[in-house]
Each structure stands twice: as structure tokens, then as C-alpha cells.
Amino acid sequence: MLRRKPSNASEKEPTQKKKLSLQRSSSFKDFAKSKPSSPVVSEKEFNLDDNIPEDESSVPTPEDAEKSGKKLGKKWRAVISRTMNRKTGKKMVKALSEEMGDTLEEGSASPTSPDCSLDSPGPEKMALAFSEQEERELPALSRQASTGSELCSPSPGSGNLGEESTAPQYTGPFCGRARVHTDFTPSPYDRDSLKLQKGDVIQIVEKPPVGTWLGLLNGRMGSFKFIYVDVLPEEAVGPARPSRRQSKGKRPKPKTLHELLERIGLEEHTSTLLLNGYQTLEDFKELRETHLNELNIMDPQHRAKLLTAAELLLDYDTGSEEAEEGTESGQEPAVSTVADPKVDIPRDSGCFEGSESGRDEAELAGTEEQLHGLSLSGAP
């Protein structure tokens, strides 16, 4: 029977075992090597506000961290950046303090300021002042950024005041007036619109068909919408009536014969006329040349005055009667048209007759003045 030969695994040389172990270790990344221990987390909670030593030996630098291969946390990175900022800040402060010290030494060497060294601040005070200045500059910049828009945005009042001061005030012409019935406050960015208050009266300059009119309010020219205003009717200025004004300035019609004779300066003939039947003005209107012959009034000036006064009285009375008839005839067609609208009756306003009566009054007053002038010229 065949027998199996015993294996010679145990008889292998130690050198071969060492080779195998080296191969395994190299292929499996050296598991036998001890693993790096994880950093121990302290039970006390880390706080950035705590005082951290600023010595180079106590604080790990970025180079040491890269050599060790340890991963730093966010807290450590913050600590490192803080320390680096402090170091750079100190260097800048030292450089500034040295420059300031040099300038102060130059100032102390001058004879004009012998006591400058006593009042000059030291480098430590300068460093504190510099740090405080940096802290103040940050909020100042933020304030400037926040208020930048306010400064840049133009206020509505400033632009309007500038325009009002430079632009001359509009004086006319105007095409009407309008009263505001609804308050309206325009946008602060709209410089052309007018601020309207109820009861304001606007002088209208232009009425375009678009609906936004142009007007003058409180000395300021601007636009406004017609829906906020009511157009005021234009004041109808009637034509002047010179006849009434002239009649007011002149004397009224005499009421008695004696008053008429006093005006023309012939009071001496009053008794003669009264005794011969001329008691009133109605009787005096019928005076003729034949009557003067019967009354034995032969003075040509007196005869002319008396005849002219009688004619003017007659014309004045006939004119007034015709004016009254004209007014009555103007009223009668209106009544008839109401009763029977089909009847066609010519209308008469009586304006023409009224003008003749006023003209007669003026002529009567003019003749009286002429008679008075003749009497004065004929007097010795």
C-alpha cells in the first residue's frame, strides 16, 4: 500500500516565513501597525471668548497640522485665523507706532514744542486707539451704505423749490377757472402735478383733450386732472349803460312851471303865464309863437327859450308814452302766445324805444343848458 509522504511545512525555513509576512503586510497596508489615537475631546465645552495663549509654542500652526496629518475642526480653524489676524494687526500697529514715534521725536526736537514729549501718547495707547478706530470705521461704513439711498434719492420739495425760484411766474393769459372738489396728493416723484385741496381755485392755462389740464395754483404752474375740479362759469360782464349814468349826472325833469322857468332864467314871465291859463307843464307844452304874441313877449331870446323848452317837454312826454306802449306790446304777445301758440305775432322788446327816451332826456338837458347860456349872455 502506498503511503502519503508527510508534508514538510514545518520544515520551512524562517526566512520564507518572514518573506510571506512582509508580502502580506505590504499587500494589506500594514494592519499590524498601531492605529493613531483619536484626539481626546475635553468634557468642558469649547468657547471662543476664552483667553487663548498667544505664544507660538502653545498654538498649533498650519505647518504642524499638515505634518501630523490630523484633521482640524472648524473651531480650531477659527482659533488659528483669529490668532493670525491678531499677529498681523499687532505688526501693523507696531509699524504705525514707530512712524508716529519718529514724527513725535522730530516734533520734540523743534524749539517750538518743548513739552510735546509729556503730552505725546505712547505706542500702547496708539495701538488701542488704532484698534478702536478700526472698530468704529466698520459701523460707519454700514451706516453710509444704509443711508446712501436716502442721500441719493432727491427730496420732492428741494427740486420744486429750485424750479420755482429760477422759473418766472406765469401771468397769463388764462382760459377759465376751476374749483377743486376732491383732495389730491401727487407722488413725491411726480414734480409736474399740483397738490389739490378742496376749495382751491385754479387758473386754467390749457385744456388738452387728454384730460390732464395745465393750470396755476398758489403761484406754481403744474398739471392736474379735470375729474378733481369743477369748471366755474365765466362772469358775464354786461355792456355799460351810458344813458343811465348820464341821466344820474344831470338834473331831473322839472315838476312845475315855476321850476322850469327858474332853470331857464325867465322867472319874470311866471305871473304872465299863470294868469293866461298856463298853470302846469301840460299847458306849457302847447305854447306857440302866436301865444307869445298874445302874451306880449317880444324879446327874441326869451321867445326862443320858451319855445325850445315847450318843444323838449312835448318830445320827452311823447317818447316816454311810446316806450310804455312798447313795453306793454312786448308783454301782450307773450300772453297771446301762451294762450294760442299757433298765432304768429312779431315780438317787440322795446329796447329801441327806451334808447329814444334816454336820448330825449339828454336833448332836454342840453337845450336847458343852452337856454341858460343864452340868458347869461343876454343879461346886461
Curated annotation (Swiss-Prot):
Pfam families: SAM_1 (PF00536), SH3_2 (PF07653), SPIDER (PF12485). Residues 84-93 have a biased composition (Basic residues). InterPro entries: SAM (IPR001660), SAM-SH3_domain_protein (IPR051725), SAM/pointed_sf (IPR013761), SASH3_SH3 (IPR035721), SH3-like_dom_sf (IPR036028), SH3_domain (IPR001452), SPIDER (IPR021090). GO terms for biological process: B cell homeostasis; B cell proliferation; CD4-positive, alpha-beta T cell differentiation; homeostasis of number of cells within a tissue; positive regulation of adaptive immune response; positive regulation of B cell proliferation; positive regulation of CD4-positive, alpha-beta T cell differentiation; positive regulation of immunoglobulin production. Keywords: Phosphoprotein, SH3 domain. Residues 1-174, 318-380 are annotated as: Disordered. Residues 173-234 form the SH3 domain. Residues 22-41 have a biased composition (Low complexity). Residues 318-327 have a biased composition (Acidic residues). One of its GO terms (cellular component) is cytoplasm. Residues 252-316 form the SAM domain. The modification Phosphothreonine is found at T61, T103, T112, T318. The modification Phosphoserine is found at S27, S34, S42, S97, S110, S113, S120, S320. Residues 143-158 have a biased composition (Polar residues). May function as a signaling adapter protein in lymphocytes. Belongs to the SASH family. This is SAM and SH3 domain-containing protein 3.
